[in-house]
């Protein structure tokens, strides 16, 4: 877990999200829960640059059926949506407990249903790349009628996981209201 601590994750955050370590796979293990707090999947995240693939999932785990941290975020009217679980953990660490992750750049119909069911306001904090732009557009298209905001990641950084707590707070406080067609 030292790798995550070195990347700015606090011990308290790792404990809050019940992060573990697999000696057998030499990976960080991240549990994923459903709205009823039941563990529905495990993510094995590579900790070394040479490890491929970067993510391993337990057999039968369907990422498209869940939003990471939905069990906690569902208590709020507003949600911050990130792509990765580590991004969501970093945003939560910055004080935004109403954060979820889609566990990939694709947003599924089931994920959209959950977003529409639980939240009135949606803050899109997608990665700073082409896939992140596609994710942002998909959420905007599927969540019309909700209050929609977008967050900009500073140039030179890829995702919220690369940001400091101060940068995350500043980015979310300066979110842009989405109005009309997104280009």
Where are these regions (language model features)?
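Phosphate-handling DNA/RNA-contact segment within nucleic-acid enzymes
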Residues: 2-119, 135-136
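Acidic beta-strand-to-loop metal/phosphate-binding motif
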Residues: 81, 119-131, 152
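A short glycine-rich beta-strand->turn/loop micro-motif centered on a GG-aromatic cluster
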Residues: 99-105, 149-158
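Acidic, metal-coordinating catalytic cores used for nucleic-acid/nucleotide bond scission
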Residues: 106-108, 126-137, 157
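Alpha-helical scaffold elements adjacent to nucleotide-binding pockets in ATP/GTP-utilizing enzyme cores
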Residues: 114, 138-142, 167
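Conserved phosphate-handling catalytic cores of large alpha/beta enzymes
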Residues: 128, 135-144, 148, 152
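C-terminal or mid-to-C-terminal helical accessory/interaction module adjacent to the motor/catalytic core
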Residues: 150-157, 163-183
């Amino acid at each position: 877990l030292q790798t995550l601590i070195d990347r700015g994750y606090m011990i308290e955050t790792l404990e809050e999200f019940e992060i573990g370590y697999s000696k057998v796979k030499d990976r960080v293990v991240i549990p994923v829960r459903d709205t009823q707090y039941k563990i529905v999947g495990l993510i094995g995240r590579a900790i070394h640059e040479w490890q491929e693939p970067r993510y391993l999932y337990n057999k039968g785990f369907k990422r498209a059926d869940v939003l990471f941290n939905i069990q906690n975020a569902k208590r709020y009217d507003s949600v911050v949506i990130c792509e990765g679980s580590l991004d969501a953990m970093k945003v939560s660490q910055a004080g935004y407990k109403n954060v979820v992750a889609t566990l990939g750049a694709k947003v599924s119909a089931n994920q959209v249903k959950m977003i529409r069911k639980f939240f009135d306001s949606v803050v899109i904090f997608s990665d700073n790349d082409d896939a992140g732009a596609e994710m942002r557009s998909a959420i905007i298209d599927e969540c019309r009628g909700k209050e929609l905001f977008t967050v900009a990641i500073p140039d030179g950084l890829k995702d919220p996981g690369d940001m400091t707590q101060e940068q995350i707070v500043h980015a979310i406080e300066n979110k842009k209201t989405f109005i009309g067609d997104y280009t």
